[in-house]
Curated annotation (Swiss-Prot):
The reaction(s) this protein catalyses: dTTP + H2O = dTMP + diphosphate + H(+); UTP + H2O = UMP + diphosphate + H(+)
Major place of residence: cytoplasm
Coiled coil: none
Record organism: Rhizobium etli (strain ATCC 51251 / DSM 11541 / JCM 21823 / NBRC 15573 / CFN 42)
Function per UniProt: Nucleoside triphosphate pyrophosphatase that hydrolyzes dTTP and UTP. May have a dual role in cell division arrest and in preventing the incorporation of modified nucleotides into cellular nucleic acids.
Classification via HAMAP family: Maf
CDD domains named in the record: Maf
Keyword match Hydrolase: yes
Family in the record: Belongs to the Maf family. YhdE subfamily.
MF (Gene Ontology): dTTP diphosphatase activity; UTP diphosphatase activity
The protein's enzyme class: hydrolase
Official protein name in the record: dTTP/UTP pyrophosphatase
Subcellular location: Cytoplasm
Database matches in Pfam families: Maf
Length: 206
């Protein structure tokens, strides 16, 4: 029988948990890492996603150091960045920030980058960056006003979650949908299985 290694998800995102559950994976532990997500001067959005996903994984690894309960476990982290050109749209915490982001996204293409980072049981670090191109329709003031009132923009990169009401704003998308949600499922499973994590024996039997 294949060994069922433990998987630590260095995130508290319900969306990422749901996506892993969709693939039949139940993380053994959730470890949201509180790191400084401020972009460095002139940092490219792709580079930011790569750096932050690595920093989250490394912080989780440091947090379990010396704890034999988690010896030999996998650590998975992810960070999603939304950008118009090189302009990074952070996680909106206030309505005026969300309003600014929505005006910028309205009628334009933008890119969503998710960096995924996997720490293997022998402590190798593997990374992958996934990019999706998204185009919003031109938003009316009425749509923006009602979306802001919904509160669904809070804490979201680019002030929106595609799996919620803002999904109605998407005119066109090229690339992974799950990447925009927050965890590119195909690439994540590829990364896990490529490093010996047994995904498929965890699938339920009918």
């Amino acid at each position: 029988m294949a060994l069922k290694y433990k998987l630590i998800l260095a995130s508290g995102s319900p969306r990422r948990v749901d996506l892993l559950n969709q693939a039949g994976i139940e993380p053994s532990r959730l470890m949201p890492m509180d790191i400084d997500e401020t972009p460095k001067k002139s940092e490219h959005p792709r580079s930011l996603a790569r750096r932050l996903s690595a920093e989250k994984a490394e912080a989780a690894l440091a947090a379990i150091k010396g704890d034999i309960t988690w010896k030999g476990s996998y650590i998975l982290s992810a960070d999603t960045v939304v950008a118009v050109g090189r302009r990074i749209l952070g996680k909106a915490e206030f309505a005026d920030e969300a309003l600014s982001s929505l005006h910028l996204l309205s009628g334009r293409n933008h890119l969503v980058y998710t960096g995924i980072c996997l720490v293997t049981p022998d402590r190798k670090i593997r990374q992958k960056i996934v990019e999706t191109k998204v185009r919003f329709k031109r938003l009316s003031g009425f749509e923006i006003e009602n979306y802001l009132a919904s509160g669904q923009w809070r804490g979201k990169a680019g002030a929106y979650g595609i799996q919620g009401l803002a999904g109605t704003f998407v005119q066109k998308m090229v690339g992974s949908y799950t990447n925009v949600v927050g965890l590119p499922l195909y690439e994540t499973i590829l990364l896990l299985t490529g490093e010996g994590f047994d995904v498929h024996s965890r699938w339920p039997e009918g």
